[in-house]
A protein has these predicted regions:
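Macrodomain-like recognition of ADP-ribose-binding/processing modules
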Residues: 1-151
């Protein structure tokens, strides 16, 4: 999918908001190529609708970590949270924003999320992070767990 300039500006949080589709969605899981792959199906009573939030992290691939712009990260994270607040979203599942393929530094990303969530804590009932660690590559899960422990 190629984004228009307006969509790129939106998902980059340039104006303090990001894309939020408030039409409820439900994930549909297809058949696996073979047994033992993927996840089991949820029971019908455990299936829940969700809203889609799109927000683009800075792509640090090939860039020097010295060029990392924490103010830009903070702006984009604040835009995510402010978008949810403006829409009355009180339960949010976020990610290790840009810490995988885009090579953003997970300790800085996690700490920035912690600070920005703390500023807005009265607006959320649940803030969770869905972070998968396959056992190889960066351990973003461990970093986020350590930084958020006791928060």
């Amino acid at each position: 999918m190629e984004y228009s300039d307006a969509m790129h500006r939106l998902v980059s949080g340039q104006d303090g908001r990001v894309y939020l589709d408030t039409s409820p969605r439900v994930c549909i899981k297809g058949a696996e190529e073979r047994d033992g792959l993927g996840y089991g199906l949820l029971a019908d009573e455990d299936v829940f609708p969700f809203f889609e939030l799109r927000s683009a992290a800075v792509d640090m691939r090939g860039a020097s970590q010295k060029s990392y712009d924490n103010a830009e990260l903070r702006k984009r994270i604040a835009a995510q949270l402010d978008t949810c607040m403006a829409a009355g979203v009180r339960h949010v599942v976020l990610s290790a924003f840009g810490c995988g393929a885009f090579q953003n530094p997970s300790p800085i990303v996690a700490e920035t999320y912690k600070q920005e969530v703390r500023k807005r804590k009265e607006h959320f009932d649940v803030v969770a992070f869905a972070i998968f660690h396959a056992g190889y590559g960066p351990d973003n899960f461990g970093v986020f767990r350590e930084i958020f422990e006791g928060a």
